[in-house]
From Swiss-Prot:
Organism: Shewanella sp. (strain MR-4)
Signal peptide feature range: none
Enzyme class, UniProt record, top EC level: transferase
Function as written in the Swiss-Prot or TrEMBL entry: Involved in the regulation of the intracellular balance of NAD and NADP, and is a key enzyme in the biosynthesis of NADP. Catalyzes specifically the phosphorylation on 2'-hydroxyl of the adenosine moiety of NAD to yield NADP.
Name this protein carries in UniProt: NAD kinase
ATP-binding is among the record's keywords: yes
Lineage of source species: Bacteria, Pseudomonadati, Pseudomonadota, Gammaproteobacteria, Alteromonadales
Name of the gene encoding the protein in the UniProt record: nadK
Protein localization: Cytoplasm
Any one GO BP annotation for this protein: NADP biosynthetic process
Length: 309
């Protein structure tokens, strides 16, 4: 028997300007990364000289020397007005899944590859960050996903994702069979290597590599992207962000299936399980330098052509 869910429609939040200044700032970074450590040291010194209270995430605090206030990620969320993540999008995603439950702004310094979520350059962050700290910034809310695995009607595992929740085989890729329902309405059965359910934030990540469309961050939508479907007619589909996605795994599948959240957290799935993916009540409060332009980011990161005239 399937599980029925009441679908509610939360209010959308648009990008807004903020003028609130910050007092307590948290520093988060990729552990054991020389470039990240260098940037974190510069940030800590620069912020401390200006009189800010600075808390450093405990996994990187020991690498920054003495006179460092080390705390865990939950304490950064509870105590800080602003969290600065130094690293790539993966580091931002890991921090965001925790910080989204708190009312803390998050901004990134790019020490990764593409860096869709990390705006500030690592070697010249001071000018842009100074303006942000003076209240010259834009705030953008990005919604998260909640993924749940049910077995015989009982919740077995759950977690959140900023980018995507992916149903897939375990360590060895192979075709799996499952049914997909949107708001308890049957959409189709699928034979594929898996299914990506992505937010607009994640539409430039794994979903893009699998042939999905790019969704602008302000869209209240989800995109479902099949992975190597065994039919030529199967294409990605965009649905309302308030939709509840249910995937029912065929009892004929082998074991060792998983649901991955942002590629970081893995939930075990058995044949016959039901996977529910829906919009989370949590939102990431991203801070951008004032005048942030999403299409400039796409041109820069994806190598799109510049203006002709």
């Amino acid at each position: 028997m399937g599980i029925n869910f009441d679908v509610s429609r939360p209010k959308a939040r648009s990008s807004i300007n903020m003028t609130t200044k910050f007092h307590t700032i948290g520093l988060i970074g990729k552990p054991h990364h020389p470039g990240t450590n260098q940037t974190l040291k510069r940030l800590h010194h620069w912020l401390t000289v200006q009189g800010y209270e600075v808390l450093v995430e405990e996994r990187v605090a020991s690498e920054l020397g003495t006179h460092i206030v080390a705390v865990d990620l939950l304490e950064i969320g509870a105590r800080c007005d602003l969290a600065i993540v130094v690293g790539g999008d993966g580091n931002m995603l890991g921090a965001a899944r925790v910080l989204a439950r708190f009312d803390v702004g998050v901004i990134g310094v790019n020490r990764g590859n593409l860096g869709f979520l990390t705006d500030l350059p690592p070697d010249a962050f001071e000018e842009a960050l100074a303006k942000v700290l003076d209240g010259e910034f834009d705030t953008e809310h990005r919604f998260l996903l909640e993924a749940e695995v049910y077995r015989h009607g009982m919740l077995k595992a759950s977690n959140t994702a900023v980018n995507e929740a992916v149903l897939h085989p375990g360590k060895i890729a192979h075709m799996i069979e499952f049914e997909v329902y949107i708001d308890n309405q049957f959409m189709y059965s699928q034979r594929a290597d898996g299914m990506i359910v992505s937010t607009p934030t994640g539409s430039t990540a794994y979903a893009l590599s699998a042939g999905g469309a790019i969704l602008t961050p302000n869209l209240q939508a989800l995109i479902l992207v099949p992975m190597f479907p065994h039919t030529l007619s199967c294409r990605p589909i965009v649905v309302d962000a308030c939709s509840t996605i249910k995937m029912v795994v065929s009892p004929e599948n082998g074991e060792n299936l998983e649901v991955s959240c942002d590629g970081h957290v893995h939930l075990a799935v058995l044949p016959g399980d039901e996977i529910i993916v829906r919009r989370s009540s949590e939102q990431l409060r991203l801070i951008h330098p004032k005048g942030h332009n999403y299409f400039h980011v796409l041109r820069s990161k994806l190598g799109w052509g510049s203006k002709l005239f």
